[in-house]
């Protein structure tokens, strides 16, 4: 599948990785898949993909079933509602770096085994993962879950995607490595001494552009709105792409509005 065709979708391998965590706690796949609108037959198709919205719905269904927004990957659960509280705490931060720091500190208060530390310089902002020595070493999916939560929130708060420079992990290369490279960045290494993600530092001083009014729709759509890679739906590029998706195929008759401008008969997204 071409890279462009993968945008906005998630590999069935990540669906399987998510379900494996809920199975360990005796939760049946069928109910979770039904809530997400994912056909069970897709699990037998290694090249299948689901939409970000479907995977986001599965994410939320598993979190509700386990009452754990970290999917049981830490000895202390991240109870349902934790992400809401984290978002509210980070919303009043001064800038991007402080917002990320608040999210990381919140996770430190919630989880027992996996923590992160921030190290900022002129060249990069490093999110370094630290895990309790007595705990089992985290798998790649645990790192990714943590990252998606704090990264997705921070990108939304500043209204733009933060470029990633490099990522290193202590765990071995996962089976779905191609999917994790889409999630993180191309420069991604495994079996390394330390686990960390380097951010482009330009985001650090950017102001928070979200408000209490925009928080509600963000939480309603989370994590589907950032589960793949955060996109600001109000940015010019996204508006241009949305307009292009709404255009009818070449040669298709176009309706004319009362004001004389042309537009498809059906609005984009209308049923």
Where on the chain are the PLM-derived regions?
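Residue-level recognition of alpha-helical structural elements
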Residues: 11, 25, 29, 51, ...
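N-terminal low-complexity or simple alpha-helical regulatory segments
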Residues: 1-126, 149, 174
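Generic alpha-helical segment signature
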Residues: 11, 76, 96, 143, ...
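DNA-contacting interfaces and partner/effector-binding or oligomerization modules
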Residues: 115-206
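Short polybasic/polar patches that bind polyanions
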Residues: 23, 34, 156-158, 182, ...
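Short hinge/gating elements
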Residues: 84-90, 132-136, 204-205, 225-226
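Short coil/loop linkers at secondary-structure junctions
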Residues: 28, 39, 69, 160-163, ...
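Extended mid-to-C-terminal alpha-helical interaction segments
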Residues: 179-271
